């Protein structure tokens, strides 16, 4: 099963309508309150697994300020950390922070972004953003990096960063690889329906393990768990 459950109230897709701050807060609070109740239940036996950690996918500081608390273990911030506000809030609540690589504000298409030296740009980006997070009061152990597959990147950009993942691993922070059913898989396989990209997802899972990634964001947890189990036995 999953070690972390990642929830969000607003789709990251640029072709989906944005929701208001109040609506996002309301949706997230409703889930977090129910999650808190479930997580506090005593296990029926000693062998029962502990409940997964909770990650909340949001980026607007006005929302983050209202939903962070002891029930939230990780803030999945897709804003590329343009300032220190979300980092300060995470430090205040001792919540881990996931920093995603991208450009510009979320929900705005960046389909024509051109990169010169993508991996160097990403390394410089993460060095700058992790410095902001550490200065805000977070420890290195509380920071996770996300290369932002498909975000402000073309097919060849995505393939390059997947081939050169070791350059991000060497930065010394845990790396999350969001591989599940991604557009780059559909482009490689010529498959438009994301639900039919699970085989490609497993290929990227095995590749990510080989490269040294620490965490993987997936939809089909059972299939991916089985693949990881076999890989770990080899």
Where are these regions (language model features)?
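Active-site-adjacent loop and "lid" segments of alpha/beta metabolic enzymes
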Residues: 12-38, 47-54, 59-61, 68-70, ...
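Catalytic domains of carbohydrate-active enzymes, especially glycoside hydrolases
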Residues: 1-8
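Phosphate/pyrophosphate-binding loops at sites that engage ATP/ADP/AMP, CoA/4′-phosphopantetheine
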Residues: 36-42, 129-142
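Acidic helix/loop microenvironments that form the catalytic cleft of cell-wall polysaccharide enzymes
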Residues: 149
């Amino acid at each position: 099963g999953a070690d972390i459950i990642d929830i969000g109230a607003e789709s990251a897709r640029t072709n989906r309508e944005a929701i208001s701050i109040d609506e996002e807060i309301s949706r997230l609070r409703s889930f977090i309150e129910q999650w808190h109740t479930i997580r506090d239940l005593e296990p029926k036996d000693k062998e029962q697994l502990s409940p997964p950690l909770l990650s909340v996918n949001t980026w607007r500081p006005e929302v983050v300020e209202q939903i962070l608390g002891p029930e939230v273990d990780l803030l999945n911030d897709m804003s590329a950390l343009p300032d220190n506000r979300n980092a300060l809030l995470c430090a205040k609540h001792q919540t881990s922070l996931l920093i995603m690589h991208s450009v510009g504000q979320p929900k705005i298409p960046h389909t024509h972004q051109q990169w010169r030296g993508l991996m160097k740009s990403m390394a410089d980006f993460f060095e700058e953003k992790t410095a902001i997070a550490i200065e805000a009061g977070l420890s290195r152990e509380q920071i996770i990096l996300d290369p932002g597959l498909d975000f402000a990147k073309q097919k060849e950009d995505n393939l390059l960063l997947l081939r050169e993942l070791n350059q991000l691993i060497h930065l010394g922070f845990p790396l999350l690889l969001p591989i599940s059913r991604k557009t780059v898989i559909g482009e490689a396989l010529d498959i438009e329906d994301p639900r039919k990209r699970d085989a490609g997802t497993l290929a990227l899972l095995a590749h990510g393990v080989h490269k040294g990634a620490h965490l993987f964001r997936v939809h089909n947890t059972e299939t991916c768990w089985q693949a990881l189990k076999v890989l770990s036995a080899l």
